[in-house]
């Protein structure tokens, strides 16, 4: 029967996003459990009970724990519960029975027979009474919880139908369906009052015992329209929610801000917000309409204040081992009663443990050990305890494990019996062991704490609270929620499907990679179509591009919230890169032996990276954060390993294979690999884990699926207008342990910030108290402390990222349509009402009674059966300006890729003013002029090429004192959050024209954030630098040469002054001796350099030629001997009669001049040999020449022919 219901009657939940519910933080009340240590009081999760097709089911509001409580309940549309007795009561109208069962589905029993025509029932949980109405007889009857002592409370009523009571206010309410009226009386049956009368039918009533309001369902007479109405307990302040729904409403229940109601026509159960007129959840049992519906939670049955014990009556003192159900108050006698295993102390105030082992009635065959409230049997070495927990048997192992025992088998006289290790017990199947020493961890979701060899209890890690089932652990603090990339937008949704909406949707193109930073509360995501990586606040504001260049196909991204870095995979470039959270210090982590990386996860505590590779050698790999120490985690039985995540509490690795449709898990080193789910997971892309569940996205049926992280069971599918749900992120202070929000802006606290379980708690200094916002501090100043102000902040009251988002959107009137129209649907099975119609991934099936059609998603079109993508770029309408951008079609949308010289947001492209932003390449002395999509450079009124240098006559006018480019207009400064945004001393400014933040860069840097070097500028200035270097080198060489020449000239002057003292001989005698030995002088010419000598030349006019022709040949020959190899001479030009001196510099030994021919008949040469073998440059004046002539008669004779008015000059 149960299998039949699961297959044919799937239950479907539909949700849309809501504001905060009262579930975020409950006050500690009776029935709620308190956490350990300093954790706050935590209430249990509410769940729903409803009747359906002759059975009664229960299910959590998030779609999990869907169970059948009663298989054969009959026609049971009337039901109620007693929370503190943990009982469910219902009326079987067909058998005329009042029945009950425990809330866990055990111990079903009949309470009593009941009359016909019972139309309503309610439980007085304070007075322990049952109240029901009989529409046919017009009476309301009261009885005790066992069906005894019945009495008529009210009679002579007009068709009383539905009944509701508030035992705290001591009121009973009922409706008259025929008369269309509402009534009220006290619980004594007096003070009857008519609250409302209408001509329409009233089909259901329910109470909000917290807000003290009465709700009812009102239908028009033909049943076409239904709506929910409410009023206060006096019948005033009536509110009609006519636009809540158009379906035929039937049953109703309330909890907090939500209304649970069932419908006839749609055969569904919905949840709506009772104040905002918005539908929230849809339960879809396909064929049979649901009956009674009740939400179960202790807040729905509060205790009355008058029920509190008097000081002298509060006798039950809880201390020591007196916890949980050990001490119980008897509601009538106000005395303490003790649980099994305890006895009341003599003073009647305490419960004391009973030592069962001392009374010899324990039944143990060999040994007994007492523990508080119980005992257990023990066995000596060599014996094992049989499954009955009493008998010991010698350990004789079975020859073969034919019984398929999960642990081991022992041979007994009754045959082979399975037994379990110490700390575990045998399950009812007789084969499986359960306990701390068994694979199921004793059923505990986190910690299993042994109490005895056969008993244990479950515990939780710090920051988690044990739930009422004493097995599951839930994170304390705010409600967690999911962030996921949906290709064309980023969405958020709570685990129960509420608060479902779009976070970022403005022309996202294609986004697959996503992660969340819990410290700064920002999201990081990568655009596959636009090819950049950016971040934004949780409300979608302050979007910043971090990585814009050299990005191809980024499909995975992970934040290191401890070391403040992020890493991403690029499947197109086949590498893994990393950067700090501001986009600085980008580096390649993995580039060798990687083919198609996709998913990536980081373990900050272990300092390791984990990623998936979908390439030719599919595998799961790991490395250090620097890319070294690579290790293969898994390489076998993989095809397309896609998403990967880490359970930081248990150090387990989870991944999914998109091709094989499997979910797997293993230790961080790859050991203990286990397949968690298979075949029913579709095409998984990404995966996330938190608390007891693993979430993964599915592309086959666009949705998000959840399974138990240990067993892979209890699968729930969450869907709703999804395109391609990709990366998944759980947002909660404990989702990424070790994060300290106090590190960023002091956690938002004015005075003191204290981190506790990933949340920031604000404290105030002495003399101050916290303001109601929990962040600011108020001075006492002798005034009374404001209400709701304390010194510590409860985790349950912490402001979450989604809280801020909800408040911001609640205050906005221009919320997008998609944010209001998104509706999520939770499916317990994959079956729906669409039957054979399959809409594919681009459409969603919508059932209307017997018909079902495909409703295409936004950006797609279809014929009711199939949907296809609309190519916006191929339409006649120009969606992207062709002059400034290029249109790129994506699934369900498009993006505008800006051309060079433009910048945009994926829709609009605006011209970049390169001149203002300082990203042009005009020369230092050039004037930059912005143009559409480009710019021009002016050099003294003449156009020049970008990068060309202008003459120095045009001084630069765009450089400020700090080395930055000046701008023509004044701009707003960037907010403090942009500190460090501009790199390399750039200045951040806000440009209103493009609605962007930009950087004013210093010379040599360009880019949006001044992150790139200006290569053209560097090359240009490098060329100028080389020219300057060559000039400097040339100047240095010239200077050195000049210094060398100056040194030589100084040495020459010095030796010239020293020459007279060293050279005392008569120069004529020396020269006459050399003249008499011409042969020797010629022989010596080869080894000695030419000596210094003087040649006196005279050139006369032709009119005086007789004198020169009168010379004898012998005399001419004698003179010609002094003219050989002259290096210096004095010429006496005949035309200007000015002697000239030519000086030589060769030194060595004394060499007589060789004979050489003179200049001919027009002149003659006179040579004077300097007699010093160390000849230095000397000057010969007139006096010196006369002395030489006087010493030589021949020279004197020949010199007499020269004109006497001619002067010798140097």
Curated annotation (Swiss-Prot):
PANTHER family on file: PRO-EPIDERMAL GROWTH FACTOR (PTHR46513:SF5), VITELLOGENIN RECEPTOR-LIKE PROTEIN-RELATED-RELATED (PTHR46513)
Gene Ontology biological process: epidermal growth factor receptor signaling pathway; positive regulation of cell population proliferation; positive regulation of DNA binding; positive regulation of MAPK cascade; regulation of receptor signaling pathway via JAK-STAT
LDL-receptor class B repeat copies, ranges: 86-127, 128-169, 170-211, 212-258, 480-520, 521-563, 564-606, 607-650, 651-693
Topological category with respect to the lipid bilayer: Single-pass type I membrane protein
Pfam families, per database record: cEGF, EGF, EGF_CA, FXa_inhibition, Ldl_recept_b
Cytoplasmic side: 1051-1210
Ranges facing Extracellular side: 23-1029
Subunit description: Interacts with EGFR and promotes EGFR dimerization. Interacts with RHBDF1; may retain EGF in the endoplasmic reticulum and regulates its degradation through the endoplasmic reticulum-associated degradation (ERAD). Interacts with RHBDF2.
InterPro entries named among the record's database cross-references: 6-blade_b-propeller_TolB-like, cEGF, Cueball_EGF_LRP_Nidogen, EGF-like_Ca-bd_dom, EGF-like_dom, EGF-type_Asp/Asn_hydroxyl_site, EGF_Ca-bd_CS, Growth_fac_rcpt_cys_sf
GO molecular function (one): growth factor activity
Compositionally biased region (Polar residues): 1120-1134
Entry-listed glycosylation sites: 38, 104, 117, 148, 321, 401, 814, 851, 925, 934
Assigned GO CC terms: plasma membrane
Signal peptide bounds: 1-21
Region entry Disordered, spans: 1065-1084, 1113-1135
Function: EGF stimulates the growth of various epidermal and epithelial tissues in vivo and in vitro and of some fibroblasts in cell culture. Magnesiotropic hormone that stimulates magnesium reabsorption in the renal distal convoluted tubule via engagement of EGFR and activation of the magnesium channel TRPM6.
Domain EGF-like: 312-352, 353-393, 394-434, 432-474, 738-778, 830-868, 869-910, 911-951, 970-1011
Localization per Swiss-Prot or TrEMBL: Membrane
Organism: Felis catus (Cat)
Coiled coil: none
Keyword terms: Disulfide bond, EGF-like domain, Glycoprotein, Growth factor, Membrane, Repeat, Signal, Transmembrane, Transmembrane helix
Residue stretches spanning the membrane: 1030-1050
Disulphide-bridged cysteine pairs: 316-327, 322-336, 338-351, 357-368, 364-377, 379-392, 398-409, 405-418, 420-433, 436-448, 444-458, 460-473, 742-753, 749-762, 764-777, 834-845, 839-854, 856-867, 873-887, 880-896, 898-909, 915-928, 922-937, 939-950, 974-988, 982-999, 1001-1010
Protein name: Pro-epidermal growth factor
